[in-house]
């Protein structure tokens, strides 16, 4: 079946190339409604505005077709005990090497994870210190502003008190002068 499919693909390639070549030699379309090959036949059904339609008829494979050949594997030679031992040792070395490589990879991965965690802790500590410093600075600024506002308020109250005392004194002087 696979051989038939391959032959079909090849014939279709040839068909399109044949059509191309024919159109070069014969600019006017030829009236070839049937193309015949060894194991297939192509009939043109009708022409359409969107393209052409074909009917493809595959002939059954001939009874003399070649049976799929299986390649015989080369005969294995007998291995000696030394050769078997060498192969086993080589396999053991490969296994150990692969194991060492996996362990190395895991160690590198753990080291990377440790570095990432260390960096995250440092950044967190730096952020905490910066936030604490900003908070202390802000609290100091708020305290200074509060003290300045209180001093200004006390100054205004003292000024009002002096003014009130002066007004009382002036009133007493007026009462004494008028009385």
Curated annotation (Swiss-Prot):
Membrane topology, from the record: Peripheral membrane protein
Signal sequence, start to end: none
Principal subcellular localization: cytoplasm
Entry GO terms, CC: cytoplasm; growth cone; lamellipodium; membrane; neuron projection; neuronal cell body; perinuclear region of cytoplasm
Residue stretches in coiled coil: 74-179
Keywords: Cell projection, Coiled coil, Cytoplasm, Membrane, Phosphoprotein
UniProt KW Ribonucleoprotein keyword: no
Spans traversing the lipid bilayer: none
MF annotations from Gene Ontology: calcium-dependent protein binding; tubulin binding
Localisation: Cytoplasm; Cytoplasm, Perinuclear region; Cell projection, Growth cone; Membrane
InterPro entries the record matches: Stathmin_CS, Stathmin_fam, Stathmin_sf
List of residues that carry Phosphoserine: 16, 50, 62, 73, 80, 97
Tissue expression pattern: Expression is neuron-specific and found in cerebellum, forebrain, midbrain, tectum and spinal cord.
Region (Regulatory/phosphorylation domain), start-end ranges: 39-96
Residue ranges of every copy of the SLD domain listed in the record: 38-179
Pfam name, any one: Stathmin
Gene Ontology biological-process annotations: cellular response to nerve growth factor stimulus; microtubule depolymerization; negative regulation of microtubule depolymerization; negative regulation of microtubule polymerization; negative regulation of neuron projection development; neuron projection development; positive regulation of microtubule depolymerization; positive regulation of neuron projection development
Region (Membrane attachment): 1-26
Function: Is a key regulator of neurite extension through regulation of microtubule instabilily.
Family from the record: Belongs to the stathmin family.
Name recorded for this polypeptide: Stathmin-2
Phylogenetic lineage: Eukaryota, Metazoa, Chordata, Craniata, Vertebrata
């Amino acid at each position: 079946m696979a051989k038939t499919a391959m032959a079909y693909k090849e014939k279709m390639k040839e068909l399109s190339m044949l059509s191309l070549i024919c159109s070069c030699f014969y600019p006017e379309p030829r009236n070839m409604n049937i193309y015949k090959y060894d194991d297939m036949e192509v009939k043109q059904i009708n022409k359409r505005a969107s393209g052409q339609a074909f009917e493809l008829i595959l002939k059954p494979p001939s009874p003399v077709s070649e049976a799929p050949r299986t390649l015989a594997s080369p005969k294995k030679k007998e291995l000696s005990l030394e050769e078997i031992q060498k192969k086993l040792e080589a396999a053991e070395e490969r296994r150990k090497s692969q194991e060492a490589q996996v362990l190395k990879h895991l160690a590198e991965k753990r080291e990377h994870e440790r570095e990432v965690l260390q960096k995250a802790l440092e950044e967190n500590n730096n952020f905490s210190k910066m936030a604490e410093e900003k908070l202390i600075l802000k609290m100091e600024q708020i305290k200074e502003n509060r003290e300045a506002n209180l001093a200004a308020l006390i100054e205004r109250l003292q000024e009002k008190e002096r003014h009130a005392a002066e007004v009382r004194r002036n009133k007493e002087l007026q009462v004494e002068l008028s009385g």
